[in-house]
């Protein structure tokens, strides 16, 4: 898995002088595009979930890919990318079984993405919004259960929970791997710069 992460990192970000947060944003946007289109949509089709879930996933994947492409050209829409992911999860919650489904598990990779992509007060605010949003979804599910679709059977619920949690776990691991890869890259760049400066003094 680590080798795959490093290969993906080299493919999506050949630059060596981009800021750390830009590198993370670009790689994560590309990762979301691949996961949504290559993993989530095929899994949803196997589970027979409503077509609207695939529409949300496809839209998220395409726009994320566009954000990654635009970032290569100097436009880094980090906050819109984060907000788009959160809104997509909110929409999917109501049509993918609510608290009985696996949508809330996808808040964990989004939290990992938040930690890697933002810093300081912005990171704290984003994590707070993320937590409050998840609690609000649970409260709506409890107070107005008629607003949320439900699985047709226990088997459907089991399949959704199993595939959703495993996919979310793997995605979280990939996000953390990208964060660590970008951090090591930044450390190596700084060490090379320091060595060059030390050599110039000599």
Model segments located where?
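Alpha-helical transmembrane segments and their helix-membrane boundary motifs
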Residues: 19-32, 51, 120-128, 157-170
